[in-house]
Amino acid sequence: MNSIEFPLLDRITQNSVISTTSNDLSNWSRLSSLWPLLYGTSCCFIEFASLIGSRFDFDRYGLVPRSSPRQADLILTAGTVTMKMAPSLVRLYEQMPEPKYVIAMGACTITGGMFSTDSYSTVRGVDKLIPVDVYLPGCPPKPEAVIDAITKLRKKVSREIYEDRTGSQQETRCFTTNHKFRVGRSIHTGNYNQGLLYQSPSTSETPSETFFKYKSSVSPHELVN
């Protein structure tokens, strides 16, 4: 169930002593201990939440959902990522310890989905913010597809060399855009613009001569109506 082929972990002597490397040992220890950070922003997360149930039981893969990025090594971005959420997503990724992995789940996360054509506030692909290891297309992907993506990620982890991954991440390091706020003149002075207010004339303020003059000029038929 959790068997992954190791190209370098096959040197077994006659005395049943396994000869391997530190990279292979580290990769093997992380295969069944991927702790995902739940980052759901849309309907794709509902499909991922069904994996927690007894039907799919993703605990057999060693997946333990975490609510803190400092305790997670995998983040599943499920749903639409907006411009306002982009700095928060990058900050969560930076707070995760190395080595860390990203699975982009759903069409909205990969390309923007239905919001990619005429939306002014949607990120066209989460890979513009953080590096993605596995792309999982669908709208939304089925739970079986999520399990397949996790299996592919575990195969990638088993063949990984830590030094190479660290070097590649340094070359494609993401960055956080700082928001700049400019303090302008306050428009809340406490005084209302009287020119914008509509003041309807009251009957008490209307002179009696004008009122009776207007009443005498109106026909009885108009008064009835």
Swiss-Prot record:
One record GO biological process: electron transport coupled proton transport
Any single GO CC term annotated in Swiss-Prot or TrEMBL for this entry: chloroplast thylakoid membrane
Keyword 4Fe-4S belongs to the record: yes
PROSITE patterns given in the database record: COMPLEX1_20K (PS01150)
Essential cofactor(s): [4Fe-4S] cluster
GO molecular function: 4 iron, 4 sulfur cluster binding; iron ion binding; NADH dehydrogenase (ubiquinone) activity; quinone binding
Binding positions ([4Fe-4S] cluster): C43, C44, C108, C139
Entry keyword set: 4Fe-4S, Chloroplast, Iron, Iron-sulfur, Membrane, Metal-binding, NAD, NADP, Plastid, Plastoquinone, Quinone, Thylakoid, Translocase, Transport
Family as reported in the entry's similarity comment: Belongs to the complex I 20 kDa subunit family.
Subunit relationships: NDH is composed of at least 16 different subunits, 5 of which are encoded in the nucleus.
Protein name: NAD(P)H-quinone oxidoreductase subunit K, chloroplastic
Organism for this UniProt entry: Nandina domestica
Gene name as annotated: ndhK
